[in-house]
Each structure stands twice: as structure tokens, then as C-alpha cells.
Amino acid sequence: MEELLHISFVNDGRDIPSELDEEEDAEIVVASDISDNDLKLQFWTNALPVIVDAFGGNSTYSNVSPAPRSTLDGFVGISGVNLYCTMRLRKHTLSANIWIDVKDKEKNKRLFDVMYARKDNIEKHVPYNIGWNRGDDKRSSTVNVEIEDVDFNDTSRWPELTQFLATTCVALKAELITACEDELRVVIDGN
């Protein structure tokens, strides 16, 4: 087996070769020393208070506790319409989502259409691409806003990431759920 040689350069006043020059704010990316579940728990523990505050306290995420899961579900008051956040460690993505499933495919599509009619309004409030998935071949429908290339081990980015979730979830709820709540309830109730 080949023997590995470890070389360490100590800044002792000698010139550092130009090819090894240090950058003042060089960022070193290292593998996380914690488990995926611990990382998820730490991220949600950090993010949840910011999300709760964005909703004004006693609201959508106020009764939610951090957990070592990939998703964090909020309560919007309409059965079958769900607002949730997702962190995917392996895919390096973070998203705010609406999932529609009232156990009736036709109603789900009508609920999606009510929200989709507000597409122009939500796009004014969310500066990211919005994924509209009516899912005609499935029972459920989704709306999601996702950012990619997220390194969850880089805790210096957590404030930016939690702010993304907070502002995006508030906008999704305000523009696609609260603003059309009466229409959504009419579809669900079958009137």
C-alpha cells in the first residue's frame, strides 16, 4: 500500500509559494462531522424561529417542532392543502412547497387551477422560478420554489437560506392560499 505524506505549511514568516498563496477569506469546504439527521435537526432548529416570526408568531409554523426530517410541515387551515419546506441533502436543494391532495383527483386539479390563476400575483412577490405541477397523470398537484447548489454544511449561509424559506412560505400562503381561501373552500365543499 502506498504511504501518504502529509505536508503542512505553517505561516512562520517565510514566503509561501505563489501556487499555494493564501486568500484572505479562503473558504475551505470540509465534509461534515455530524450525521445527516443531526444536520437536519440543527438546520430546522435554526430556521424555525425565523419562519415563525415571518408569519407573525402564532400562525402557520407556531406549533411545529424541529425534527431530524427532510421536511417541515406548516398548518394552513385547509384540509388537503399543505405548505411545507424541504431540504434535500443529497440533491443539495432547499424548497418551499404547496402540496394539494384532498383525496379527489378532480378537486385537486380544480384547486390547483384556482392557485394557478394567481400566477402573475405570486411571481411579483417571489424572485425565484416557481414550479407549477398540475400532475394530470397523478392525484396530487404541487407548487414549489426551489434553490439549488445548497451546501447545508456551510452554516454561514443558513441566515440566507432561512430567510428564503420564511419569505417564500409567507408569499405562497398569502398569495395562493389566503387570497383565494373562499374559492378553495368552495371547490373542496363541492359547491
Residue ranges of predicted features:
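Acidic metal-coordinating catalytic centers involved in nucleic-acid phosphodiester chemistry
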Residues: 1-28, 32
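Ampiphathic alpha-helical segments that act as solvent-exposed interaction surfaces
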Residues: 114-126, 149-190
